[in-house]
From Swiss-Prot:
Location in or out of the cell: Cytoplasm
Pfam families referenced in this protein's UniProt entry, alphabetically: TACO1_YebC_N, Transcrip_reg
Keyword Iron-sulfur (UniProt): no
Similarity remark: Belongs to the TACO1 family.
Protein name, as recorded: Probable transcriptional regulatory protein BamMC406_2210
Lineage: Bacteria, Pseudomonadati, Pseudomonadota, Betaproteobacteria, Burkholderiales
Gene Ontology molecular-function annotations: DNA binding
SUPFAM superfamilies: YebC-like (SSF75625)
Species: Burkholderia ambifaria (strain MC40-6)
Gene Ontology cellular component annotations, sorted alphabetically: cytosol
Length: 242
C-alpha cells in the first residue's frame, strides 16, 4: 500500500457519486435492462441482475423504477437493446484506463470516447492493450477500527480470497467476482457492512499522480465518466490530494 489514503479516496468517491445520483440512476437502469434481457428477470437466479438491483438499492433508487427496468429488459422493449463495448487506452504518463460502455450506437460512442482521450492528453489503445494490468474481482472496503481478526475469519469462511489492512487502517477484502453476492451476504449476516462493495477491475499496480499531472489526469477521467454511454471507468492512476 502506498502513502495515499485508500479510505480518503473511497470517501471522495462516495461523495462524487452522491453528487451525480441522477446519472448513476440512468446507468443502473440501462444495466438492469441489459441484465434482465440476457439472463431473465429473477434476481435470485441471475447474478448480474442481482448485482445491479443491489447497486440500485444502495443508490436509493425507488423499487418501481427497478421493476420497470426489469420489465423492459425481459420484454425486449425499445431501449433495452444496448451493446456492451469495452475501450482501453492511456492517460497521462501512460496510466492505464478501461472504459466500459452500453450503447445503441457504437459509431457515436467510439467517437466520443476517442475525443475525450485526445482532448485531455491521453490516447486510445487496442483491445487487450491494458486489460491484462487489471484483475476482475469483488472488492469490499471496511472502515478503520473494524476488528481485523473477526473480519478475516468471517471473510475467509465466506469464500474470500484475500484480506489486507491498508496503511490508513481500512481493511480490504477481495473475492472472485462470481462469488461477490454470496460473500457480501455472508459478511452482512456476520455483522460486517462494507463502506464500499463492488465488482470491479482492480489494478495490479497503482501509479500516483500529484500536482498538475493529477489535475490533468482527473480532467480526463471526468470527461470519460461524463459521457452518456459510459457505465464504468477503471484506472491504475491514483489522484493524490495535497
Amino acid at each position: 500500500m502506498a502513502g495515499h489514503s485508500k479510505w480518503a479516496n473511497i470517501k471522495h468517491k462516495k461523495a462524487a457519486a452522491d453528487a451525480k445520483r441522477g446519472k448513476i440512476w440512468t446507468r443502473l437502469i440501462k444495466e438492469i435492462q441489459v441484465a434482465a434481457r440476457l439472463g431473465g428477470g429473477d434476481a435470485n437466479s441471475n447474478p448480474r441482475l442481482r448485482l445491479a438491483v443491489d447497486k440500485a438499492a444502495d443508490a436509493n433508487m425507488p423499487k418501481d423504477n427497478v421493476k420497470r427496468a426489469i420489465d423492459r429488459g425481459v420484454g425486449g422493449a425499445d431501449g433495452a437493446n444496448y451493446e456492451e463495448i469495452r475501450y482501453e487506452g492511456y492517460g497521462i504518463s501512460g496510466a492505464a484506463i478501461i472504459v466500459d460502455t452500453l450503447t445503441d450506437n457504437r459509431t457515436r460512442t467510439v467517437a466520443e470516447v476517442r475525443h475525450a482521450f485526445s482532448k485531455f492528453g491521453g490516447n486510445m489503445g487496442t483491445d487487450g492493450s491494458v486489460a491484462f494490468m487489471f484483475d476482475h474481482v469483488g472488492q469490499f472496503l471496511f472502515a478503520p477500527g473494524t476488528s481485523e481478526d473477526a473480519l478475516m475469519e468471517a471473510a475467509l469462511e465466506a469464500g474470500a480470497d484475500d484480506v489486507s489492512t491498508n496503511d490508513d487502517g481500512s481493511i480490504e477484502v477481495l473475492c472472485d467476482w462470481q462469488a461477490f453476492s454470496a460473500v457480501k451476504d455472508a459478511l452482512e449476516a456476520a455483522g460486517f457492512k462494507a463502506e464500499l462493495a463492488e465488482v470491479t477491475m482492480k489494478p495490479q499496480n497503482e501509479v500516483e499522480f500529484t500536482g498538475d499531472d493529477a489535475a490533468k489526469m482527473q480532467k480526463l477521467l471526468d470527461a470519460l465518466e461524463n459521457l452518456d454511454d459510459v457505465q464504468e471507468v477503471y484506472t491504475n492512476a491514483v489522484i493524490v490530494e495535497e
